[in-house]
């Protein structure tokens, strides 16, 4: 296991760690029980969480045992953000999200065998602590000076930070302590913005038990311009297919920038170093083929949505630009297309003409522009060329009875729903 950290670093999964030599020796000694936490701040995990799960998978494949903590307690509080106070969700909502995220994380790890992953909820032990317990047994070991020096707290001091969010570090440190006591957990992993919480937990364990535990954090994934990776114009890219369709998910990764795609492949793809280095050469020599982007999109969509949904997403991408049969697409895929295209909605009454549908869907700006597209042979309804500018849509034109696609030229596509 001596090369484990080297491999994780090559894959870009290590931003920082506690004493590297000590951590490397600890991992080499035998199976290590480690944990990563997921707070239920929404009903679904997103791309950022997948980075953590890739690290979990890599460690588990090397024989280490994962504890996946879903924060039923910490999710009621919220880790402080740079930009302001978090909205506090109702207990019932958080409890529902806990169950949803439990189901999601279990998909990405092995829950059988000697080093089977175990899912835990920090509500189970946190709820047993009284206010006096927390202040006396936990808070006593934390320096307010050091808590104030934390980057996120320092930035929030001027605008204000509640005692609730200020105290979040105590709860996360308590989690590490409880998992160490209950399961022998000696390593906490997380995103780079959790570094302060992780080291605080390690220090708390050292002070209260004398034991040495470890921490390892992954970098925050960004685009070439430095902004957060994992968001589109329509919002966050989720792993829940009800929130982000397989089509939208596949397209998101297919659009990865050339300058970043190899970085993303190393993090998210199970491909070997040799395969990824070969794709790096292809990207440099023939960037227009987008070989690395296709591999990235395929690998991650297979993982999150399954092979069949990935194939459906690819078929949809071909079909909307006239290179496949739209009527072969299933209703789920058709509806995801309309969502991605920002479909206009027909409220009822007589259906519009194709030209009217093109205007409504934003494919052309004006009816005269639509008529011109028809006259030039560049107007399409469900990939069929339109010859008559006064042709009116019918029931049969709505795919799966729901969506009609209009297109101008080769690439400008819109949708109308009913």
Curated annotation (Swiss-Prot):
Localization (cell): Cytoplasm
Single biological process term from Gene Ontology: tyrosyl-tRNA aminoacylation
Residues that, per the record, bind ATP: 231
Domain S4 RNA-binding per the UniProt entry, residue ranges: 352-410
Any GO CC annotation of this UniProt entry: cytosol
Motif ('HIGH' region): 40-49
Alphabetical keyword list: Aminoacyl-tRNA synthetase, ATP-binding, Cytoplasm, Ligase, Nucleotide-binding, Protein biosynthesis, RNA-binding
Reaction(s) this enzyme catalyzes, per UniProt: tRNA(Tyr) + L-tyrosine + ATP = L-tyrosyl-tRNA(Tyr) + AMP + diphosphate + H(+)
PROSITE patterns: AA_TRNA_LIGASE_I (PS00178), S4 (PS50889)
Binding site for L-tyrosine: 35, 168, 172
EC number(s) given by UniProt: 6.1.1.1
Catalytic EC class: ligase
Statement: the UniProt record of this protein carries the keyword DNA damage: no
Cross-referenced InterPro entries: aa-tRNA-synth_I_CS, aa-tRNA-synth_Ic, Rossmann-like_a/b/a_fold, S4_RNA-bd_sf, SYY-like_C, Tyr-tRNA-ligase, Tyr-tRNA-ligase_bac-type, Tyr-tRNA-ligase_bac_1
GO molecular function, one term: ATP binding
Position of sequence motif 'KMSKS' region: 228-232
Oligomeric form and interacting partners: Homodimer.
PANTHER family attached to this UniProt entry: TYROSINE--TRNA LIGASE, MITOCHONDRIAL, TYROSYL-TRNA SYNTHETASE
Role of this protein: Catalyzes the attachment of tyrosine to tRNA(Tyr) in a two-step reaction: tyrosine is first activated by ATP to form Tyr-AMP and then transferred to the acceptor end of tRNA(Tyr).
Protein family membership: Belongs to the class-I aminoacyl-tRNA synthetase family. TyrS type 1 subfamily.
Matches recorded under HAMAP family: Tyr_tRNA_synth_type1 (MF_02006)
Protein name (record): Tyrosine--tRNA ligase
Organism, scientific name: Cutibacterium acnes (strain DSM 16379 / KPA171202)
Organism placement in taxonomy: Bacteria, Bacillati, Actinomycetota, Actinomycetes, Propionibacteriales
Gene: tyrS
């Amino acid at each position: 296991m001596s090369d484990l950290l080297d491999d994780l670093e090559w894959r870009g999964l290590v931003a920082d760690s506690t004493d590297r030599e000590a951590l490397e020796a600890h991992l080499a000694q035998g199976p290590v029980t480690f944990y990563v936490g997921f707070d239920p701040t929404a009903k679904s995990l997103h791309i950022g969480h997948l980075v953590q799960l890739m690290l979990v998978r890599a460690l588990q494949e090397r024989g280490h045992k994962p504890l996946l903590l879903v924060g039923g307690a910490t999710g009621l509080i919220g880790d402080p953000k740079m930009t302001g106070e978090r909205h506090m969700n109702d207990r019932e909502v958080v409890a529902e999200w806990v169950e949803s995220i439990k189901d999601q994380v279990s998909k990405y790890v092995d829950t059988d065998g000697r080093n089977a992953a175990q899912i835990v909820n920090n509500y189970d032990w946190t709820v047993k602590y009284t206010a006096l317990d927390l202040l006396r047994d936990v808070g006593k070991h934390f320096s307010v000076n050091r808590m104030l020096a934390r980057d996120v707290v320092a930035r929030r001091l001027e605008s204000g930070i509640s005692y609730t969010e200020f105290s979040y570090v105590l709860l996360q440190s308590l989690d590490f302590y409880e998992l160490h006591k209950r399961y022998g957990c000696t390593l906490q992993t997380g995103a780079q913005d959790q570094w302060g919480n992780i080291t605080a937990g390690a220090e708390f364990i050292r002070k209260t038990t004398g034991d040495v535990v470890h921490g390892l954090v992954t970098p925050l994934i960004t685009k070439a311009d430095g902004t957060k990776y994992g968001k589109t114009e329509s919002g966050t890219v989720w792993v829940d297919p009800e929130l982000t369709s397989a089509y939208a998910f596949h397209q998101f990764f297919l659009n990865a920038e050339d300058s970043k795609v190899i970085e993303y492949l190393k993090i998210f793809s199970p491909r070997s170093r040799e395969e990824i280095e070969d794709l790096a050469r292809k990207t440099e020599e023939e960037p227009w083929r987008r070989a690395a982007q296709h591999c990235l999109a395929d690998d991650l969509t297979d993982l999150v949505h399954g092979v069949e949904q990935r194939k459906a997403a690819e078929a949809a991408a071909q079909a909307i630009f006239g290179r496949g049969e739209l009527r072969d697409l299933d209703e789920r895929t058709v509806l995801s297309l309309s969502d991605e295209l920002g479909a206009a909605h027909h409220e009822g009454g007589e259906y519009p003409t194709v030209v009217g549908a093109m205007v409504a869907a934003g494919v052309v700006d004006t009816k005269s522009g639509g008529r011109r597209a028809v006259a030039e042979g560049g107007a399409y309804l469900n990939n069929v060329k339109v010859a008559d500018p006064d042709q009116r849509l019918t029931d049969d034109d709505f795919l799966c009875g729901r969506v009609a696609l209009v297109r101008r030229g080769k690439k400008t596509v819109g949708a109308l729903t009913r």
